[in-house]
Amino acid sequence: MSFKNIKAYTTQNLQAEMAVADSYRIIQLMMQGFVERLAQSKGAIERRDFEAKSIAISKCMAILNGLQDSLDLSYGKVPEDLFALYDYMRIRLLDASRDMDISPLDEVCQLMLTIKSGWDAIPLEERKKALTKQASQ
């Protein structure tokens, strides 16, 4: 199977999953996509591929925007802190892009993996309660 066919299959598979995913799973997929785009950014910087770096970092920025948009700031400190952390991550991405330096990407990756591990650890029952509450609003 060629790379083009694999990419098309992956894209279609992701689109199908997103079509039926609940909000918890969508956030999970966004975080995973962010980590994947970070890896692409890192590879592009190491290869000195300016175009690929710009594309991958732009996609990271867009995902961060989506993650920020998904936060309900009315819940107080935790979503507010996440919002600020996503802003910090955005600044570090700009640093990496400007300086062609992978160390900010490593830092941002560790931050996102920490957030994602917490997200992934939310018990199923709590997710169901949150989704039920969200649907009733």
Regions found by a protein language model. Name each.
Residues 1-40, 45-47, 52-57, 65-71, ...:
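N-terminal intrinsically disordered, cationic/polar leader segments
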